[in-house]
Amino acid sequence: MPPKSATNATSRRAEVLEAALELLADEGYAGASLRKLAARLGMAQPSLYHYFRTKEDLVEQVLATYAGQMFQALSPDQLPTTLEDVPRVTVETAVRVYQRPTHPLFVRVAISVSRVNPRFGTLMRRVFVEQATWGIQQMMKPFVERGEIDADDAVDLVRMLLNAIGLRLIEDKVMFAAHEPGPDFDRYVRFVIATGHAQLAALAAQRD
């Protein structure tokens, strides 16, 4: 068990980063400042220098932290065990990620800052393209190795599913005034999963 002081420090850092995320989501990069963050937290601004020295450091830590949480959404015991499971597991995982109150805020911040500074854009490309592709490849590796699907098709399939459900969730929770998905959301989820199954069937037919 970690010492109580270490646990308290970890908890305090998480509190600071969540407040920073909310500030960036509310006011954007231009409107956010360490002074405003300190005011939200009820602490002296110099105390924030224990966590980050500049606003750029703040943004990078926020992006890295919440990107890490996003990738932790699918635990090893939840991985699909059959190719047929892939569409359902992929879509359900994306929906579950957006059920975290902080994730829509993270996506809003990631989109808004990616063009502000090249270092933020590079970090977000690494997260949403390079790391995401690597994660997809690892999830699909057993099926590729068994010859059930080509490597490129495996990545394209999962990306198609993630983009289809992700854009709908961005519309509901990020781009416009946040609101719960409409009554057609469950139908849309079923449609996306069924489309994934149809694509798997089409790919299998091409291989026969």
Q: Over which residues does each language-model region extend?
A:
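Short, basic, alpha-helical segments at the C-terminal edge of helix-turn-helix-like DNA-binding modules
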Residues: A64-M70
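Residues in soluble alpha-helical coiled-coils and helical-bundle/repeat scaffolds
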Residues: R53-D57, Q61, Y98, R115, ...
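Hydrophobic/aromatic-rich alpha-helical bundle segments in the mid-to-C-terminal region
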Residues: T122, R126, E130, K141-A194, ...
